Amino acid sequence: PLAMPLASLLWVSVLLGQPQPQPLCTTAEVFLRDDRRMAAIVEPDTVDDWRTRKRVAGCRVTAAGGTTRGVQAEAVGFYERVRAVGWVRTPEPRDAPSEGSLRFRSGPADCLFNVYGAAMLNTDAEMLAEDRRPLVAGETRYHVYVMCLPVMPAAPRDSTPPRPR
């Protein structure tokens, strides 16, 4: 009689130890792996959402790739390609274009993409992505970090408090 509950508990512990699918990040992950030929690591995430002023369950993708044209040119080409494959800018995107971050929408997800050069997050995911995508001769390392949240309407223009000066 005790064997069945114990077996069930063991099965649950195995399932909990497995990476869980992150459907909000699926399109971004596939794009990074298949189109951009990057190694991509997907993880669950909780993000402070400016639209709702709440913590929202989402996911993140940490990817590593190589470029022969330099990181800045790669970033420009990257965002052109994001648009070409069907991602659209989110309504009233609040992103950081001077920092290389742009927010796009595809299907059920609003995702903030950030393109950068050398490793700077110092996370296990960043190191694992680099290990999975070695550079070949003539390539320079670049990374993409993506945070995805469920699609939501844009916040009213007066809903965000002004930034302190």
Regions found by a protein language model. Give the residues of each.
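An acidic-aromatic pocket/loop used at catalytic or ligand-binding sites
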Residues: 16-165
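Sec-dependent N-terminal signal peptides
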Residues: 3-15
